[in-house]
């Protein structure tokens, strides 16, 4: 396996310690079902800071067994309990490698850790064209092969179609159910994300909120 551990995947020593511990524990549970571990999101595309979520992708040979899910639930509980603030800000999904490779297989449920959570749930949150593009083009390897070897190229127009659909779907959700978004945090969050999506749509590839 290439690059078992990248020694300094981020500029934050405490976060690097959390990530090393996390990957070691996951590998111990998955054994030969482990393919690789990667950072995506702001730690991949840039403009991260001390308040950023830590978005990860774990790639596996095949769907998780019941026993593996049980073991990983324990791992996430243990990592969340680490006395380092970064440990409570992990977010990501477990992708079977053939699902990750083909963007046509987007939208299905994966085992997912929500930001601030300590347990996995089924969710399609990360199973998108955008996440695949970021992993392929900018993914930060924590362990495993280079991410470009795991994801097929994604046409620019496919990416633009995804961005347009996200803008429309999210806009409809906000207008249909505005109450959860009627606060200072979400209003700023929405503006930043729409600026980013418009910027990405113009350029044809994803960037950071700051760039948007």
Regions found by a protein language model. Name each.
Residues 188-191, 206:
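Conserved functional hotspot residues or short segments at active or partner-binding sites
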Residues 39-41, 45-74, 89-94:
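Catalytic metal-binding acidic patch
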Residues 205-212:
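Short, charged amphipathic alpha-helical segments flanked by flexible coils
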């Amino acid at each position: 396996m290439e690059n078992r551990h990248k020694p300094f995947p981020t500029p934050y020593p405490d976060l690097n310690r959390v990530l090393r511990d996390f990957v070691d524990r996951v590998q111990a549970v998955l054994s030969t079902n482990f393919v690789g571990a990667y950072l995506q999101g702001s730690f991949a595309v840039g403009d991260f800071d001390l308040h950023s979520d830590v978005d990860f992708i774990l790639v596996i040979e095949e769907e998780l067994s019941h026993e593996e899910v049980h073991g990983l639930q324990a791992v996430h509980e243990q990592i969340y309990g680490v006395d380092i603030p970064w440990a409570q800000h992990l977010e990501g999904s477990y992708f079977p490698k053939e699902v990750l490779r083909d963007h046509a297989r987007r939208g299905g449920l994966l085992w997912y850790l929500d930001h601030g959570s300590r347990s996995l749930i089924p969710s399609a949150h990360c199973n998108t064209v955008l996440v695949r593009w970021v992993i392929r083009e900018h993914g930060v390897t924590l362990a495993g092969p280079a991410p470009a070897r795991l994801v097929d190229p994604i046409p620019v127009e496919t990416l633009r179609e995804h961005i347009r659909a996200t803008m429309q779907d999210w806009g409809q959700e906000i207008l249909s159910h505005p109450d959860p978004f009627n606060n200072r945090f979400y209003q700023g969050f929405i503006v930043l994300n729409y600026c980013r999506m418009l910027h990405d749509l113009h350029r044809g590839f994803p960037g950071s909120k700051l760039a948007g």
